[in-house]
Amino acid sequence: MSMVVYNNQEGEEGNPFAGALTEFSQWLWSRPLGNPGAEDAEEEAIAAQEELEFPEDEAQARHSCLQRTTSWATPKEVSPSGRVYQTVRHSRMEYSRPTMSIRSQASYFSSSARPLPPPPVPSLMSWTPIAKYHPSSPTSTSSKLRRAAPKLIKRG
């Protein structure tokens, strides 16, 4: 079982789902994973944060990600691997500059009989608005649409 919840927002005001998603994310993150009484439970937690600054635009981009995985032994009838794995992750990205602010967050939960490969974490570089750094594509070069370069005509 796995579940992913996404929320993209330009400011939280006017977004009726922003508060609900924040509450859900907090509930999901605080929820005890695994079998609390299991003596052989193993837990792994990862916290990552990255930031980018664009001085020419007075812009900043931030990405933070928290992930927790818990596993514990279980009978072979329940899980062929003999363990159950549960993972919860919360990812939040922000991009802001004087004229705009964009926030995006996602929560992820999975429970499996075998360790799952980690879900892809959005890259901050691919998420930030970088279109202005790439030249626009050239206009069509077909012979019918090609325009001749302007010529200077001298009159005597």
UniProtKB/Swiss-Prot annotation:
Residue positions where Phosphoserine is found in the record: S71, S79, S137, S140
Keyword annotations: Host cell junction, Host Golgi apparatus, Host membrane, Host mitochondrion, Host mitochondrion outer membrane, Membrane, Phosphoprotein, Transport, Viral movement protein
Subcellular location(s) of the protein: Host cell junction, Host plasmodesma; Host chloroplast envelope; Host Golgi apparatus; Host mitochondrion outer membrane
One biological process term in Gene Ontology: transport of virus in host, cell to cell
Stated role: Together with movement protein P3a, facilitates long-distance movement of virions in host. Transports viral genome to neighboring plant cells directly through plasmosdesmata, without any budding. The movement protein allows efficient cell to cell propagation, by bypassing the host cell wall barrier. Binds ssRNA.
Record-stated family: Belongs to the polerovirus movement protein family.
Name of the featured protein: Movement protein P17
